[in-house]
């Protein structure tokens, strides 16, 4: 039996989602609970592998089980054993051919920035502070330049291992908030550190150090040295996982370009 689990977590105290040889991870927390329940190791398979310090409003993973347990009981048992910074939102059965990683056709991230005269210690780890004056309109113009299908070699970590760095962005915008702005980006998939590099670049645009019309040339050059900065992980949230083409079509229209992950390397 294959079980799909929807979760949320605050990433401050995690080294990321994926299990590490040492250190606290989200995967470790769940596999420890499942091992206790099954009396043997059970591997979980996530839709996304968030990095150290990155949060998730919505994340999914699946696992296979021989235990005949009601979905509400799965949810109750896991939440009872989990620490306060992870919560199981929903549990349901899925087809045995469903795969959290390969059936994921899109993701949405939100990066939160607050501004002011000084840092707010109560926002530490959950939002990024920028005290310089920023031009949000100019930043949004630059953000729009990333929409579409592009090679993002110049906007990801040089440690990115996947061969194809072509991704499609359906949404890329700056949204003004009461204390700053959010950068909201939805795409077919994202490369290692890609969202954080995009945010750092957009902040440079807001400061007047870069221009929106720099984007096409930077994409064409595919040179990370031309976009050297990376924003911290604190303000980054995995906001939504799209597990079916219908979800993307509903939000972005019937002409949306769907990438099926069984034929696309993904992070």
UniProtKB/Swiss-Prot annotation:
A single GO molecular function term of this UniProt record: RNA binding
UniProt binding sites for substrate: 109
One Gene Ontology term from the biological process aspect of the record: tRNA pseudouridine synthesis
Annotated signal sequence range: none
Documented EC number(s): 5.4.99.12
Class of enzymatic activity (EC top level): isomerase
Active site: 51 (nucleophile)
InterPro entries listed in its UniProt record: PsdUridine_synth_cat_dom_sf (IPR020103), PsdUridine_synth_TruA (IPR001406), PsdUridine_synth_TruA_a/b_dom (IPR020097), PsdUridine_synth_TruA_C (IPR020095), TruA/RsuA/RluB/E/F_N (IPR020094)
Chain segments annotated as coiled-coil in the UniProt record: none
The organism's place on the tree of life at top rank: Bacteria
Catalytic activity: uridine(38/39/40) in tRNA = pseudouridine(38/39/40) in tRNA
UniProtKB keywords: Isomerase, tRNA processing
NCBIfam families from the UniProt entry: hisT_truA (TIGR00071)
UniProt-listed PANTHER family: PSEUDOURIDYLATE SYNTHASE, TRNA PSEUDOURIDINE SYNTHASE-LIKE 1
Annotated family: Belongs to the tRNA pseudouridine synthase TruA family.
Subunit organization: Homodimer.
Protein purpose: Formation of pseudouridine at positions 38, 39 and 40 in the anticodon stem and loop of transfer RNAs.
UniProt protein name: tRNA pseudouridine synthase A
Species in which this protein is naturally found: Staphylococcus epidermidis (strain ATCC 35984 / DSM 28319 / BCRC 17069 / CCUG 31568 / BM 3577 / RP62A)
